[in-house]
């Protein structure tokens, strides 16, 4: 098949356009319900209804014919023993006694239904279909179009040949592109489904499904659709299927339940780092030198020695330099990290050290230190420390950290960033600095913490508060056991994975504790909950299935939504599409966990960075700009192999962006290309900011926001209704959002002529009716 045939006649259109830009807040009225219903109704026309099929039960080879053209869509497998063959006018069925399954094929109005019914009482794996095509359209991340002979993809699948569909695919389908048509295999879900990739003589796949013995659902359903070789037809057919299954919920429907969701429309995705309440600007270093022998500093060392993950050795080593008036950058960082660290400790209060607490601290002590909420405990510790250090050594407490937090947010709003999601790396960042959270809320921003219920650690340090729970029974009684009887290790091999079905009371306890003092958090981000790390738990005391796991995750999403939170989750795989509003990780997923040059070799130019920042700002893992190897570009970033499958389905349902490890600026030499794709795909830009990075990136972030916010406000009012290639090399691409909003991105190295408009390389043209705006990324790289 020649994909150049897909090139649309849009390239030949002569359009009359003016130079008016998309600037300022959107004043466009939302389209009527009738308009959006019309956009949905077109989906009915994509699947071919006039088709025939032929199946060989022994090999399960399946052929489909339409318009006199036949393709083998499921390749023959090793012959199986069959029994109970029956054929009627509408159905063919048989059983495979050795595999303990019954198979039924039925031709429906617009698809072929294949039902595989498991009869085994124990775990049972059945493989089908085996697919071999010239090209594959797969929902890997946002979407990929993969030729069967592309060298980098072959190398990738050679090293990653076992594919867990629940984790690897963002949606529950896969498509093959053959000479005459595309065939799309749609599943109810991808629970317990895998693919094995073969790379010789070219790329092919075989899918299998494991029926879990204790799972009450014994049926695997495929709905097989025929469409043109067009990603729009494939995606819209899948969208129609999801709507029919009642598994589709628009942002408008979600906002009816929680109006705060409207703040996400047009919002930049900003991870905001303020890990220090007490900053270098807040300390009077020369005055400190004379006070360094005071008991409080000895007490801080004792706390670090007893409770700190790294002990007190480094802290003790810098005290003599501070006393000598030689508090340089290193000494200041160690000192500030130590003081901010102990502010988190429940054990910080010591009546022998803090003999004269101020009024606020005294009232909190009277309540009982062990009865305080987490926010109250932080408030107590701050007042104890500030009162003991005094204003001779530090600025007044109310000024601590504000220059690096509230002042930055104020400047963001003043500079023209009208809509933003502000993500905090942990809820403690908000509870330690509630003024900053209030400032974000007052500015009309969404603000909320990163949270995780993936893992639990036994005796977790305060650094791992997401892996720590007050309930002492969870580690033994609520963790996941695999089929072999082993506990599944937690993140980075620490602790264990939690069973989501067993911890809902603990979720409520954590959330209630965080919100106990009415801190104005209005968003919540859930790590891993839409990333496909879903499990069957074989523990005989609490056997649960992947379906149970997903239901439990949706339950906690719905709980947070009921509290007025705008809920987001990692990646955005669509089993969670009804529960989340936004997702991070779909547009740029985590790139190559397994490459040591990126993950272990700190001398490599590709090393992505460290999790910790010695200066309390953004860890280098998130703000260090690094190149990626050429072999990874076709897999992760090359627009030649990317297709907006997810956006064609969920543009009006889930707002998706990059994984936080790979924000819009992270990849050296690709910031401009990725920005073009952000507009083309309606993907919010993401950036990690602290005080210093805000000053560094301010001009570019603000300038981009002036166009981005009104653009997305309009784009979210419609389906993504079309995606097309405008050039023979497929490097000039167009997306349409309804009838009056389009984006044309030029990823090539030559000018592209669209009617009277010249679109230079490295630019994108936004077309809104007769108005155009040029997005020029040619100077965005630093």
Regions found by a protein language model. Give the residues of each.
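Glycine-rich, aromatic-flanked loop segments that form ligand/cofactor-binding clefts
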Residues: 268-269, 436-488, 565-575
């Amino acid at each position: 098949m020649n994909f150049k045939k897909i090139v649309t006649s849009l390239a030949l259109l002569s359009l009359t356009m003016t130079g008016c830009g998309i600037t300022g807040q959107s004043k466009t009225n939302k389209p009527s319900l009738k308009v959006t219903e019309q956009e949905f109704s077109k989906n009915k026309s994509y699947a071919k209804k006039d088709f025939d099929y032929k199946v060989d039960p022994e090999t399960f080879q399946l052929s489909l014919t339409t318009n006199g053209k036949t393709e083998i869509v499921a390749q023959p497998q090793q012959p199986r023993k069959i029994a109970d063959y029956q054929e009627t006018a509408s159905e063919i069925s048989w059983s495979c006694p050795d595999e303990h399954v019954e198979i039924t094929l039925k031709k429906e109005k617009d698809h072929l239904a294949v039902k595989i019914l498991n009869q085994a009482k124990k775990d049972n794996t059945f493989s089908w279909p085996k697919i071999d095509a010239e090209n594959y359209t797969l929902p890997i991340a946002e979407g990929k179009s993969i030729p069967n002979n592309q060298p980098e993809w072959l190398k990738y699948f050679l090293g990653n040949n076992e594919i867990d569909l629940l984790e690897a695919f963002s949606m529950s389908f896969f498509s093959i592109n053959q000479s005459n048509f595309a065939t799309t295999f749609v599943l109810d879900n991808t629970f317990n489904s895998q693919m094995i990739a073969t790379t010789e003589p070219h790329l092919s796949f075989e899918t299998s499904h494991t029926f879990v013995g204790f799972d009450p659902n014994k049926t695997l359903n495929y709905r097989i659709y025929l469409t043109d070789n067009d990603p729009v037809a494939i995606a819209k057919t899948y969208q129609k299927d999801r709507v029919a299954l009642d598994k589709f919920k628009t942002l408008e429907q979600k906002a009816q339940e929680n109006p705060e969701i409207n703040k996400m429309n047009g919002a930049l995705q900003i991870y905001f780092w303020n890990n220090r309440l007490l900053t270098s600007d807040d300390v009077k270093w020369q005055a400190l030198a004379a006070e360094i022998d005071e008991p409080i500093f000895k007490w801080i060392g004792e706390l670090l020695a007893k409770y700190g993950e790294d002990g007190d050795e480094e802290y003790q080593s810098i005290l003599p330099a501070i006393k000598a008036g030689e508090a340089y950058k290193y000494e200041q960082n160690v000192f500030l990290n130590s003081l901010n660290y102990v502010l988190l400790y429940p054990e910080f209060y010591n009546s022998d050290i803090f003999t004269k607490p101020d009024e606020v601290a005294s009232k909190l002590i009277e309540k009982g230190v062990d009865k305080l909420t987490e926010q109250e405990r932080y408030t107590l510790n701050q007042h104890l420390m500030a009162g003991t250090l005094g204003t001779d050594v530090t600025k007044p407490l109310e000024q601590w950290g504000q220059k690096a937090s509230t002042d930055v947010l104020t400047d963001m709003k003043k500079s023209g960033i009208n809509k933003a999601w502000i993500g905090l790396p942990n809820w403690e960042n908000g509870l330690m600095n509630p003024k900053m959270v209030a400032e974000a809320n007052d500015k009309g921003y969404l603000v909320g913490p990163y949270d995780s219920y993936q893992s639990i650690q036994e005796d977790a340090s305060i650094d791992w508060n997401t892996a720590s729970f007050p309930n002492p029974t969870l580690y033994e009684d609520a963790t996941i056991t695999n089929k072999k009887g082993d506990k599944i290790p937690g993140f980075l091999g620490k602790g264990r994975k939690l069973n989501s079905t067993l911890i809902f009371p603990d979720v409520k306890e954590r959330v209630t504790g965080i919100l106990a003092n009415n801190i104005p958090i209005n968003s919540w981000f859930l790590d891993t909950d839409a990333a496909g790390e879903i499990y069957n738990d074989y523990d005989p005391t609490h056997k649960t299935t992947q379906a149970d796991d997903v239901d439990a995750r949706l339950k906690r999403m719905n709980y947070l939504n009921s509290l007025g939170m705008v809920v987001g989750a990692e990646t955005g795989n669509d089993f969670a599409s009804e529960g989340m509003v936004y997702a991070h990780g779909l547009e740029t997923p985590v790139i190559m966990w397994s490459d040591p040059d990126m993950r272990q070799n700190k001398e490599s130019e590709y090393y992505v960075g460290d999790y910790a920042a010695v200066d309390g700002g953004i860890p280098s893992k998130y703000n260090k700009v690094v190149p990626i190897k050429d072999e990874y570009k076709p897999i992760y970033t090359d627009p030649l192999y990317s297709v907006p499958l997810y956006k064609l389905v969920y543009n009006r349902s889930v707002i998706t962006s990059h994984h936080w490890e790979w924000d819009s600026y992270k990849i050296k030499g690709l910031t401009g290309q990725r920005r073009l794709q952000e507009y083309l795909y309606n993907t919010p830009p993401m950036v990690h900011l602290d005080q210093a990075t805000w000053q560094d990136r301010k001009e570019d972030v603000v300038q981009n926001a002036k166009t981005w916010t009104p653009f997305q406000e309009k784009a979210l009012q419609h389906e993504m209704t079309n995606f097309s290639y405008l050039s023979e090399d497929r490097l000039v691409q167009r997306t349409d959002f309804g009838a009056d909003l389009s984006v044309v991105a030029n990823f090539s190295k030559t000018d592209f002529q669209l009617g009277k408009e010249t679109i230079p390389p490295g630019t994108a043209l936004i077309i809104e009716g007769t108005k155009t705006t040029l997005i020029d990324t040619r100077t965005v790289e630093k």
